[in-house]
């Protein structure tokens, strides 16, 4: 009888590092999970208004309109930055014998690449407007997928957002990216009848 048929795939240094760090995180950091639904109607309406205004301001330039278009994730990044400013303990990192509270909201965003997951950082999100967050998010995600991020563009960060909503995922649990203390896992929005 023939044995199982398979192919062993080599592991890149990046994947090896990701696996090591996340395994250590899960084994050494206390994880607890809070799940809740939020109403997105106003965010989606505001996004639609902003994107319509941006398209009109582009005067028929499709590329300019596309570059200015905001995603739902851009609003989530800005909301997280505001929340981190209001709750400094969530904007902190564990360093063994001390906890470092950050004064800026440097938000890492999880980006899937052919070599694994990487978390480029939008620095000082609390001081940025939605347009800047949207522009930087697109630029960093493209650089990540192209393998062109510089170390300072993905090392550090005070908080991570992992959004799988665009893939239709309704719920998942994310692993904290050490030494950060928190990660926000975002699922898909859905139409739902909500009683008054």
Where are these regions (language model features)?
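C-terminal catalytic/motor cores of large multi-domain enzyme assemblies
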Residues: 1-196
